Structure formats: structure tokens, C-alpha cells
UniProtKB/Swiss-Prot annotation:
Associates with the 50S ribosomal subunit. The gene is der. GTP 1 binds at residues 9-16, 56-60, 119-122. InterPro entries: AAA+_ATPase, G_ENGA, GTP-bd, GTPase_Der, KH_dom-like, KH_dom-like_a/b, P-loop_NTPase, Small_GTP-bd. The lineage of its organism: Bacteria, Pseudomonadati, Pseudomonadota, Betaproteobacteria, Neisseriales. Residues 3-167, 176-349 form the EngA-type G domain. Residues 350-434 form the KH-like domain. CDD domains: EngA1 (cd01894), EngA2 (cd01895). Residues 470-485 have a biased composition (Basic residues). This is GTPase Der. GTP 2 binds at residues 182-189, 229-233, 294-297. Residues 435-485 are annotated as: Disordered. One of its GO terms (molecular function) is ATP hydrolysis activity. It comes from Neisseria meningitidis serogroup B (strain ATCC BAA-335 / MC58).
Length: 485
């Protein structure tokens, strides 16, 4: 599992700026696709060979007892519980504040390692900036600049040093490894119990039970499977905003380790933004996806039609996924769900022959040429497979930068139908053939044309005539001498 790093601190100390630096992006983890909820609180990062997850917790005002700031403080404390390491960010320009001292007191009570980072330290004397923050008793401060990157690498390198090198991903297994993901209280734990055929206690409120996903190997109808149990993220009692928010972290970690994700929805509730966000993580990671709409037996026919319309409207970007309407409690629809898991796994791990890929590409071009972009028309020559889980098709040609998104969607649907890629995302990459003379400096220089005057041409012509006449005379003389002998 990737270690999770939580960014904690007062408002306006630069947590979002540091988050963007650590994730190397200014956008959300989820692509800006229609229907996907943008979420700037979670992101991926990597230093060397070590990947990590980072959480931007929002501003922490511990002295507020109610309102939105109080909720943000609750979410921050939840982040500390869920994280593997905590970066406590303070403002080097403002200096030490009473709120910083209160936050530090709470962080010292946590068993998680805490790293004190003095932000906005660009251009200043590091020793002077760090001096007053030793009062927080959180070890040596790291003086950094989230905006310019100063000192950030050393901070993250020290954090990750305590975590082992990542092992080979579980997604490389030769059988389906699937994760049950979704919001709290949608029936994930019930579905896990129905799948395994036994009651398992997975909702204990004990330290550790909500932190690590459990990998369980089992067989069903003679076929091996591995399930990643993330149901332990749910806590007893009321599921508040903080718990629901951090269920996303569990989904991210589980999706990374799986090759198939099973997204569980609650038919008794409307499709929430969080559902779309979690689905977006699976799509971003390129994992095969199966959707289980749970508690289907407990709603009326009218409600069923409403749920289907809601799904079509809010999750239409999952048109490649198979939807199953099940009852985990009564174990209805589980067999069909497993058939789709196996099919999605097979599609994600498919090996496509290059000749067939190219034939499908040429057939698609014959049916519909790519539209021109100004005076340029893209020319696609051949294609081959570039990867699995998800399948990647690499198209080679010229002027491929001019291919529109709509034509890419057309090609995606064509390849999906030709290879029966049900349940997995399909990615198309364009590889433009390079012109060796693209730069003017590299072009071979043509010889300049010589201008020859008319008089020079006449002189040359007369000279050739005289030469020819002299040759004829010599020939006649030599022939006469030969016969005279």
C-alpha cells in the first residue's frame, strides 16, 4: 500500500500550494471529464521509486466549536487518524501563533510521526525562520517553500525513508484481484460476507482495523479470486462528513492494488457526488470496473426506474462498465456479478494481435475519415498494443495532433466492439512519425541555379560543333590510311 501523508495546519499557511507541488499538478486527481466531480483534496505523488498519497485537509481552527471551521477541524483530526505520516505546516512569515501551539498539542498526542514544516521560507535565513518553532517540541523544523519547491524534496524524502520499497503490484496476479469500493453504509461489508459465504467482523472501532485493507484469497466455482476488503473503513454509528470524505482514501488505495474494482451503490439513496468521485478514481487508475447497485429488493418499481435514470444521468461516463442490480443481504445477483468480474478481468488483460488491430483501424478509417483541422488531415498508418490493465492501443501516423476528441471516441468504440472489451477502460495513444527535415537547419541545402547568358550558350554550342567536325576529319583520315595499306 502507498503511504498516506496528511497536510495539517491553520488556514492560509500554504497547504494547497504544497499539495500542488507534491502532486505536480494544479488540478484534481480526477480528469475534467463531463459528469465527474472535481476533488482537490486527494492526489498521487512519487519520489524516486516510492509512490505516496497526499491529503490536503483544509484549514484547522481548533478553537472553533461550531460551524464549517469546526467541521474542518474534525476532518483534520480524522486525517491524522487515517494517515501514515503528518506534515504540520506553519507560516514562516507570520511566525508562531496561539493556534499553532494548540494544533501542536493535539498532534503530539497522536501516534503518527509528525514533521514540522516552516513554509514561505524562500529568501530568508533558515536558522532564524526555524528558531521560534522549536517551542512546539516537534523536532527539527524543515524550512521549505511550497511555491518555489525549496526544501520540499528533502522533507518528503525523509518521510518516505521509513517506508519499505513498494512490492510488485497485486494487480499483476494471474487471477482477478478485485476491490469492493464505495461510500459508507452502501452495503460493502454485507457484499463481502455474501461473497465469502461467512460472517466476518469488519466494523470494529479498534486501532488498525480502519487503516489497512485485507487481501483474502478464495475460490468460487473452481476459479481463484482475491478480494481486497475495504469495508472496515465504515465506523459504527452515524456516518458524518469526515468519515465519508476519508472513505475515498480507502478506495484509492484499494484500486491501486486491484485489477478490477467493484463499485457498490445504494439503490435506496440518490447517486451522490462521492459515488462519481470514487468511480473517477477507478477510471483514472485505468482499472476494470463493475457496478453493483445494492438493496435492489427493498425499493418499489417506480423507485427502480428513478434509480436507472439517475445512473444514466450522473454516471454516463461509465458506459463501458456492466451494471448489476443485486441484494447482498439476500445473496441475489451474486453469480452474475462474478461473471462480469471475470469478463472485465479478461478484457483488461487481453492480448491483441497487431495485424488485427491495424485491420480494424483501416476499416474504421474507410467508414469515416478523420476530419480536417484547417488544411491538415491526420493520416493513420498502423497500430499495435501498447499495454494491458488497461489495454492501450498506439496509433502511428502523421499530423495525429489534429485528431479531435470525438474521433478518438469513435475509434475507442470501434476497437471496443471489435475485441469485446466489456468492463475495462481503453486508452488510445497517438505516435506521430517524425520528419527528419522538420527543422530548417537540418534540411539539405540545394545548389544555387547558375545563370548562363545567351552568348555563352551560343559559344558552347559552336565549340561542340567544331569538336565534332575535327573528330569526323580524323576518322576519315584513319580509314583512308587503313585501306591504302
Amino acid at each position: 500500500m502507498k503511504p498516506t501523508i496528511a497536510l495539517v495546519g491553520r488556514p492560509n499557511v500554504g497547504k494547497s500550494t504544497l499539495f500542488n507541488r507534491l502532486t505536480r499538478t494544479k488540478d484534481a486527481l480526477v480528469h475534467d471529464l463531463p459528469g465527474l466531480t472535481r476533488d482537490r483534496h486527494y492526489g498521487h505523488g512519487k519520489v524516486g521509486s516510492k509512490p505516496y498519497l497526499v491529503i490536503d485537509t483544509g484549514g484547522f481552527e481548533p478553537v472553533v466549536d461550531s460551524g464549517i471551521l469546526h467541521e474542518m477541524a474534525k476532518q483534520t483530526l480524522q486525517a491524522v487518524d487515517e494517515a501514515d505520516a503528518v506534515v504540520f505546516l506553519v507560516d514562516g512569515r507570520t511566525g508562531l501563533t496561539p493556534q499553532d501551539k494548540i494544533i501542536a498539542d493535539r498532534l503530539r498526542q497522536s501516534p503518527r510521526p509528525v514533521y514540522l514544516a516552516v513554509n514561505k521560507g524562500e529568501g530568508g535565513n533558515r536558522a532564524v525562520l526555524a528558531a521560534e518553532f522549536y517551542e512546539l517540541a516537534l523536532g527539527d523544523p524543515y524550512v521549505i517553500s511550497g511555491a518555489h519547491g525549496d526544501g520540499v524534496y528533502y522533507l518528503i524524502e525523509d518521510i518516505l525513508e521509513k517506508f519499505p520499497e513498494p512490492e510488485a503490484e497485486e494487480a499483476d496476479a494471474r487471477h482477478p484481484v478485485f476491490a469492493v469500493i464505495g461510500r459508507p453504509n452502501v452495503g460493502k461489508s454485507t457484499l463481502v460476507n455474501a461473497i465469502l459465504g461467512e460472517e466476518r467482523v469488519i466494523t470494529f472501532d479498534m486501532a488498525g482495523t480502519t487503516r489497512d485493507s485485507i487481501h483474502i484469497d478464495f475460490e468460487r466455482e473452481g476459479k481463484p479470486f482475491t478480494i481486497i476488503d475495504t469495508a472496515g473503513v465504515r465506523r459504527r454509528g452515524k456516518v458524518d462528513e469526515a468519515v465519508e470524505k476519508f472513505s475515498v482514501i480507502k478506495a484509492m488505495q484499494a484500486v491501486e492494488a486491484a485489477n478490477v474494482a467493484v463499485l457498490v451503490l445504494d439503490a435506496q439513496q440518490d447517486i451522490a457526488d462521492q459515488d462519481a468521485t470514487i468511480a473517477g478514481f477507478a477510471l483514472e487508475a485505468g482499472r476494470a470496473l463493475v457496478v453493483a447497485v445494492n438493496k435492489w429488493d427493498g425499493i418499489s418499481e417506480e423507485r427502480r426506474e428513478q434509480v436507472k435514470r439517475d445512473i444514466n444521468r450522473k454516471l454516463y461516463f461509465l458506459d463501458f462498465a456492466k451494471f448489476h442490480f443485486i441484494s447482498a443481504l439476500k445473496e441475489r445477483g451474486i453469480d452474475g456479478l462474478f461473471d462480469s468480474i471475470q469478463a472485465a478481468y479478461n478484457a483488461a488483460m487481453i492480448k491483441m494481435p497487431t495485424p488485427k488491430i491495424t485491420r480494424v483501424l483501416q476499416s474504421a478509417i474507410e467508414r469515416q475519415q478523420p476530419p480536417r483541422a484547417g488544411l491538415v488531415r491526420p493520416k493513420m498508418r498502423y497500430a499495435h498494443q501498447g499495454g494491458m490493465n488497461p489495454p492501450v492501443i498506439v496509433v502511428h501516423g502523421n499530423s495525429l495532433h489534429a485528431i479531435s476528441d470525438s474521433y478518438t471516441r469513435y475509434l475507442t468504440q470501434t476497437f471496443r466492439k471489435a475485441f469485446n472489451l466489456q468492463g475495462t477502460p481503453l486508452r488510445i495513444q497517438y505516435n506521430v512519425s517524425e520528419n527528419p527535415y522538420e527543422n530548417a537547419e537540418d534540411k539539405p541545402k540545394k545548389k544555387p541555379l547558375r545563370r548562363v547568358s545567351l552568348s555563352n550558350r551560343i559559344e558552347k554550342r559552336e565549340g561542340r560543333k567544331e569538336e565534332k567536325n575535327r573528330f569526323k576529319k580524323k576518322t576519315k583520315v584513319s580509314v583512308k590510311k587503313q585501306f591504302s595499306k
